[in-house]
């Protein structure tokens, strides 16, 4: 079989679509391309199974629609796989309708939006299959191998049989992640994602996932809890083996482990000690997502010794009421303590905040602004990111707000973080965006600038700060 895994180009006056490997979609004024781990794994699985594979990211490759279409249809695919998210699903419906006029290929949709609402896309466009859940790479391999025999389909597949839409039931996350191959980086054009990424201080960089996806998996706003309601990990030694290959074969200098939360406990200890034993800590830097409240100062010290550079935490708000409503299982005081410990251990700390909660007003937002700026001024946070609260379909937050009449619209185009879609009776949209800008301006505080200056060690740092300044300007533009 001939299988194309694609991201059609998206021309928009709003900016560049940040679609791949992204839990929250945004249009960016400055291009940012994130390596898509699961799609790349799917491509590798299919190639190893003997199929011909085209991996075509029209966004990251910056192809024109004409160039993209020409390359895709010259490949003559039997299957075309498209990952979608809520803010662009209507664009993908239109693209699929046009694609079906040009080719007899079966079109497959994947992603968190169609996992939450599979019936919708089956009704709104002539898509042939929808693969639900986060293990769609395994499902795609099964689908192609089944060659149209629905009796062989695994759970989680939606399909058409004559004029009837059918499905194989709820998806199951029972695949062994150690059975997934190491990604064929050449097949998926890894270099497209190696530099235009604000997280990387050193380049070239790339991504892996040691786990799928987060061991908490209860945050009510997170779209990936729809894909991954449970948690599994790869073998720690196998992960180190892959990292060693990436360093030796591709010269990778920085690695982002984009598991929703990096595995902790014995897994983390084994991983760090093996990285140190092989001397990989002297050859690359490692970034990861983490949650507050699980690691001690000694854990951060071990991570730093193992070559970790950046740890990303989701804070979302400095108001305990909001953290509790989001089921963050987090206390505000844990944030300060965790940031201080990580910084003291020599790690850079990146924080994410969200604004535009239905129950927060100017006073609560000001509290979060003060908190974020304090962490920057103390040097306990190196970087941070602010976004609007977007309740994605399938999340508990979406269900809560929809039931309470708390949504401005169900027009998915509007869920792109350009404006608030949540009704905020206690704060205007202008006040919300002003709060976000106040946080970003916290980077320009004298104490924050001083910490940045005193932490400068190499030319890589200077290049990173320059890219960071451009990102800061871009964020101020994005939320003006």
What are these regions (language model features)?
Residues 3-31:
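Short glycine-rich His-centered loop
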């Amino acid at each position: 079989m001939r299988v194309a895994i694609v991201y059609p180009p998206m021309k928009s006056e709003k900016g560049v679509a940040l679609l791949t490997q992204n839990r929250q979609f945004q249009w960016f004024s400055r291009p940012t391309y994130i390596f898509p781990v699961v799609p790349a794994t799917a491509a590798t699985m299919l190639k190893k199974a003997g199929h011909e594979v085209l991996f075509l990211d029209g966004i990251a490759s910056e192809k024109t629609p004409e160039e993209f279409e020409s390359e895709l249809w010259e490949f003559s695919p039997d299957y075309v796989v498209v990952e979608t998210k809520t803010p662009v699903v209507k664009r993908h419906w239109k693209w699929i309708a046009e694609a079906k006029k040009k080719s007899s290929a079966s079109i497959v949709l994947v992603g968190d939006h169609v996992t939450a609402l599979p019936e919708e896309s089956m009704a709104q466009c002539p898509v042939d299959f929808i693969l639900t859940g986060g293990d769609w790479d395994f499902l795609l391999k099964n689908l192609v191998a089944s060659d149209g025999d629905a009796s062989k389909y695994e759970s989680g597949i939606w399909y058409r049989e004559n004029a009837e839409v059918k499905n194989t039931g709820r998806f199951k996350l029972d695949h062994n992640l150690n059975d997934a191959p190491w990604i064929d980086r050449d097949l998926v054009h890894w270099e497209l994602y190696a530099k235009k990424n604000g997280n990387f201080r050193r380049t070239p960089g790339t991504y892996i996932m040691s786990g799928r996806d987060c061991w908490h998996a209860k945050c009510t706003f997170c779209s990936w809890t729809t894909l991954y309601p449970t948690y599994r990990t790869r073998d720690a030694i196998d992960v180190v083996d892959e990292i060693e290959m990436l360093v030796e074969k591709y010269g990778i200098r920085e690695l982002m482990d984009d598991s929703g939360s990096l595995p902790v406990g014995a897994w983390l200890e084994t991983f760090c000690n093996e990285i140190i034993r092989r001397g990989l800590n002297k050859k690359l830097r490692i970034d990861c997502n983490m949650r507050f409240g699980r690691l001690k100062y000694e854990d951060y010290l071990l991570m730093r010794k193992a070559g970790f550079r950046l740890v990303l935490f989701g804070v979302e708000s400095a108001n305990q009421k909001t953290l509790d409503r989001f089921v963050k299982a987090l206390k505000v005081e844990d944030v300060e303590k965790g940031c201080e410990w990580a910084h003291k251990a020599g790690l850079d700390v990146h924080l994410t905040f969200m604004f535009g909660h239905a129950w927060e007003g100017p006073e609560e937002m000001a509290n979060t602004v003060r908190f974020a700026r304090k962490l920057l001024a103390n040097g306990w946070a190196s970087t941070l990111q602010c976004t609007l609260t977007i309740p994605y379909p399938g999340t508990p937050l979406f269900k809560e707000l929809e039931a309470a009449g708390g949504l401005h619209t169900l027009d998915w185009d509007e869920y792109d973080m350009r404006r608030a879609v949540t009704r905020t009776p206690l704060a205007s949209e202008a006040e919300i965006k002003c709060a976000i800008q106040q946080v970003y301006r916290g980077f320009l505080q004298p104490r924050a600038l001083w910490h940045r200056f005193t932490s400068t060690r190499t030319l890589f740092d200077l290049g990173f700060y320059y890219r960071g300044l451009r990102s800061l300007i871009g964020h101020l533009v994005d939320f003006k």
